[in-house]
Design a protein with these regions (language model features):
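Alpha/beta-hydrolase
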Residues: 2-130
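A cross-kingdom marker for long, charged
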Residues: 119-120, 139, 190
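Short, conserved loop/helix-junction motifs that constitute active-site signature segments
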Residues: 132-136, 161-164
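Short beta-strand/loop motif that positions the catalytic acidic residue
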Residues: 135, 141-143, 147
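Conserved alpha/beta-hydrolase "acid-adjacent" motif
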Residues: 148-154
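Short, highly selective alpha-helical patches that border small-molecule cofactor pockets
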Residues: 155-159
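Catalytic active-site module of serine/aspartate enzymes centered on a nucleophile-bearing elbow/loop
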Residues: 172-199
């Protein structure tokens, strides 16, 4: 987005849903797109810090605002990026282009403090990676191979960042919530087998 007050404001060169860009998305597009996402996040953070100072000076503790178009991961649209068993062109909220242009975005309704504490790339402490080195107990990371929002590289980054020396990874043929037949049983069996070898 170019203008946070206008959800229709888009840079065509960085529009995930502009057919001129893909899918399939060229590696150069994905790099520029990710840079654009990070730059947008930093712009919102800068505004949130300034706005928080402004409203506090006026006697308020916080204020609400909206962040549009957050269903925006290229992997949701282009299954050739990190191929898995996930359905093509699908996210948790349905077809990505429709989800992206709806009012049901991830973090769409937020506050200044919530943005800074949960979504800001430069301020939030909610990202797992910086803290996973402190996890030194035995750990099992399970990846669902049909997940439309969490991808194998996400699970791998979690696994790699863990401080545990005893750590394992497993992949199960499942969606994000392990709703497909047999998936929850497979998950339970995987956990039970892993735990039985340790305790």
């Amino acid at each position: 987005m170019i203008d946070e007050s206008d959800p229709a404001s888009t840079d065509p060169a960085l529009d995930l849903f502009n057919q001129a860009n893909g899918p399939a998305y060229a590696p150069e597009f994905v790099v520029k797109y990710r840079e654009g996402q990070a730059a947008r996040n930093h712009r919102i953070t800068s505004w949130a810090l300034e706005e928080l100072a402004r409203v506090r000076a006026a006697g308020f503790s916080d204020r609400a605002f909206t962040v549009h178009r957050t269903w925006a991961d290229p992997r949701m649209v282009d299954p050739t990026l990190e191929p898995t068993k996930r359905p093509a062109n699908l996210c948790y909220a349905g077809v990505p282009v429709k989800a992206n242009r709806s009012t049901f975005g991830i973090g769409c309704a937020t506050t200044l403090k919530n943005w800074l504490g949960m979504w800001s790339l430069s301020h939030a402490q909610t990202r797992a990676e910086p803290h996973l080195a402190d996890v030194t107990v035995p750990a099992l990371v399970i990846n669902a191979d049909g997940d439309t929002g969490v991808f194998p590289s996400d699970a791998r980054r979690i696994y790699d960042a863990l401080g545990a020396t005893d750590k394992s990874q497993a992949t199960i043929d499942a969606d994000h919530y392990f709703q497909n037949p047999g998936a929850r049983q497979a998950q339970a069996d995987t956990i039970a087998e892993w735990a039985s070898k340790r305790w």
